Amino acid sequence: MDNKYTMKTKFFITTLLFLIGGLCLKAQTNDTDTQKAIATLKEFYKVIYDDNLGRKEEQFLKYVSKELFNKVFPPSPPGEDNSPGYDPFIQAQDYEAKTLNRSLKITSLGNDRYRVCFLLSDWEKKKTCVDYQLKKNNKGKYMITNILSDKNFYIRPKK
């Protein structure tokens, strides 16, 4: 009789250990994905909002989905400018690159959503925050697919 309970106990403990191990592995994967997404956002701001570079479509498309890029920068006929009156990625027109990148703070909001906060200049006291959704592309690289905090550029999920 003791042997029967011992086997059940061993089976229960073994099953419990497998479940705990699986949960730990999933948590590590989620943490790694979060770190990769945050690194993508840091790199985006460093590359795009650098004083020494002119912003080009190719640079944006390394970090921003084509759908979001076309919503933010719609194609316009020659001689016309259909671009927004502000930059939705910084919620402003003007910024100081060094201050912006030095003050950059990125936090995960869960479910592939992230909040990026920064100062636009040294004289600014209030941080600007922008909420994003990032998703992996077919190559496994995180891309900014939505600006959640800007109703002008929010892309409604497809049903």
Where are these regions (language model features)?
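Generic signature of mature, soluble extracytoplasmic domains
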Residues: 42-57, 65, 122-123
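Short, well-ordered alpha-helical segments enriched in acidic and aromatic residues
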Residues: 53-80
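Short beta-strand edge/turn micro-motifs at domain boundaries
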Residues: 127-159
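Bacterial Sec-dependent N-terminal signal peptides
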Residues: 1-32
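Short, low-complexity N-terminal intrinsically disordered segments enriched in polar/charged residues
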Residues: 25-50
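Surface-exposed, charged secondary-structure patches
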Residues: 32, 73-126
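Hydrophobic beta-strand residues in large extracellular and virion-surface proteins
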Residues: 41-44, 104-106, 114-118, 132-134, ...
